[in-house]
């Protein structure tokens, strides 16, 4: 994978680097952390000499050898699946422990659908960026001095490693209708920075959304047009505009402040086909699909209605959509839930109530059935492990995860048969024996 050769063909330096990887593969990445990778490799070479596996002369020669790895544009690693892979790692760690996970020689077949995973990632990114751009421009990610060669300085600015569509760039000059930019040069495996200086332009039309600054953002740029957004020395993210052949055109980007998550599941088997737990795994490994507990809000209402349909109500049953007051307890203000429209519509059928997501009907329904019954159904669907039996919970005031809620909706799509989320299809040990299989 790293050197595109068999084990017996490896040099001492190459073998030493591979031996250095298991402790912390990401810390010794040959591209992103080249200096640390070479230092760790050389330490391993030194230990090989100390323990008599190689001579001192061989050690010195091997340490001087540059770290050259085969860079692949395609291969087994899917950047879009980092959140999925990390969730699988957590489950394996919980099941087999650290020794079993890293030394057990396990072969794991997951439920991941690579095509769906790529679509999921792009869809979430598109939604987050659209929402974030509506909030306005927050300014550059950094600023550098432009005196002399800007390449080495720009190369030191940390960029997102798992958003390959984006590049870091420094603004070289700004006119009324466009900004001239210089792209971040790649670091060489042998150390140093590429001497090539790639340039491009960001036309005003590709940064027009940024002419409105976000609330609280400091306006560093002055003037009109492109100069109202960017200044020379600004370090920003850009994305290549496809289909332009006469010159390299880029569009202005910014990392969204808003977070989100997406889960795609086979509703009949519970197999998780795709998971995206955030905009960038490199920026934040926190998986918002499995680890973030959030209020489901109105997406919880179908389960209140499911409890009602199981307990004497029908789709044509009438429930009053009108003002309702709930005593919250001694010293607490009276709770008066309202519909989103802030209107009431009188007696309405259950079908209309769920179609229009009526708050007052849902609360009145939960009050009539009793919240203990709603709590029981919430647990049976796997949305909550525990839920306080208070009426606001019928409007989704409790907390759950995207994965739990997806599993609950999958149960509905599966005709009411319970669906359990699964990331792993099969696990085999080093001898090929199946030690786990998801039924």
Question: What is each stretch, according to the model?
Answer:
Residues 1-185, 365, 372, 376-386, ...:
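Non-catalytic, structured segments within soluble enzyme domains
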Residues 8, 75-78, 268, 313-374, ...:
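Conserved catalytic neighborhood of penicillin-recognizing serine enzymes
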Residues 106, 386-390, 411-439:
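Conserved active-site-proximal loop/helix segments of enzymes involved in bacterial cell-wall
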Residues 189-229:
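Beta-strand/loop nucleic-acid-binding surfaces
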């Amino acid at each position: 994978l790293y050197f595109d050769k068999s084990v017996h063909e490896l040099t001492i330096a190459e073998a030493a680097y591979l031996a250095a990887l298991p402790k912390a593969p990401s810390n010794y990445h040959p591209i992103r952390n080249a200096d640390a990778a070479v230092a760790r490799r050389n330490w391993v070479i030194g230990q090989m000499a100390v323990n008599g596996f190689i001579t001192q002369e061989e050690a010195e020669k091997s340490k001087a050898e540059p770290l050259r790895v085969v860079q692949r544009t395609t291969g087994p690693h899917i950047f879009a699946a980092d959140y999925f892979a990390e969730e699988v790692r957590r489950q394996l760690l919980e099941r087999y422990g650290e020794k079993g996970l890293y030394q057990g020689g396990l072969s794991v077949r997951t439920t991941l659908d690579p095509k769906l995973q790529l679509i999921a990632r792009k869809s979430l990114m598109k939604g987050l960026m659209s929402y974030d751009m509506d909030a306005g421009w927050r300014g550059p990610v950094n600023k550098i001095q432009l005196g002399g060669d800007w390449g080495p300085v720009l190369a030191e600015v940390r960029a997102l490693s798992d958003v390959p569509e984006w590049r870091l760039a420094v603004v070289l000059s700004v006119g009324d209708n466009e900004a001239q930019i210089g792209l971040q040069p790649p670091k060489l495996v042998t150390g140093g920075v590429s001497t090539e200086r790639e340039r491009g332009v960001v036309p005003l039309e590709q940064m027009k959304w940024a002419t409105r600054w976000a609330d609280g953002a400091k306006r560093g740029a002055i003037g009109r047009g492109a100069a109202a957004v960017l200044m020379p020395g600004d370090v920003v993210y850009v994305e290549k505009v496809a289909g332009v052949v006469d010159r390299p055109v880029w569009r202005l980007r910014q990392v969204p402040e808003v977070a989100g998550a997406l889960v795609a599941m086979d509703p009949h088997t519970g197999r998780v086909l795709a998971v995206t737990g955030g905009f960038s795994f490199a920026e934040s490994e926190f998986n918002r699909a499995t680890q973030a507990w959030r209020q489901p809000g109105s997406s919880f209402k179908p389960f209140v209605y499911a409890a009602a349909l199981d307990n004497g109500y029908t789709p044509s049953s009438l429930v009053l959509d009108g003002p309702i007051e709930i005593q919250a307890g001694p010293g607490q203000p009276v709770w008066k839930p309202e519909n989103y429209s802030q209107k009431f519509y009188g007696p309405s059928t259950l079908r209309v109530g769920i179609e229009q997501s009526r708050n007052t009907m849902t609360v009145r329904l939960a009050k009539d059935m009793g919240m203990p019954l709603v709590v029981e159904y919430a647990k049976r669907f796997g949305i909550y492990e525990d839920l306080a039996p208070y009426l606001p919970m019928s409007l989704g005031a409790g907390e759950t995860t995207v994965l739990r809620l997806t599993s609950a909706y999958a149960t509905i799509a599966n005709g009411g048969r319970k669906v359990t989320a699964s990331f792993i299809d099969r696990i085999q040990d080093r001898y090929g024996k199946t030690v786990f299989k998801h039924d």
